[in-house]
Amino acid sequence: MVEFHEKRGNAVFGVRVQPRSSKSAVSGPYGNALKVTLKAAPVDDAANRECCRLFSKLFSIPDSRVSIVSGAASRTKSVMLEGLSAEEARSILRNSSIPGL
């Protein structure tokens, strides 16, 4: 199960990224985090930007409200969703079509 934490009223959760994949998608749970496959290579912050865009679509919030708070140069990251509580984010994720959730 994906663990959500709250930091100053914003949802924060862990992500495991697999860059240079055939498609960009949320694959499912990875321990206490979400596994994400990204088409972008981890060069010039392209994979991080694509990761943020993917979560902005999934949670229906603007790109500017999704940020990587730790692990920008790592495959394991923490992502913050501004304006969504941990419970709201958990509910959206539960109602999504992502396998294994």
Swiss-Prot record:
InterPro entries: DUF167 (IPR003746), YggU-like_sf (IPR036591)
Record GO cellular component, one term: cytoplasm
Pfam assignment, any one: DUF167
Cross-referenced NCBIfam families: DUF167 family protein
Similarity remark: Belongs to the UPF0235 family.
PANTHER family: UPF0235 PROTEIN C15ORF40
Entry protein name: UPF0235 protein Plut_0338
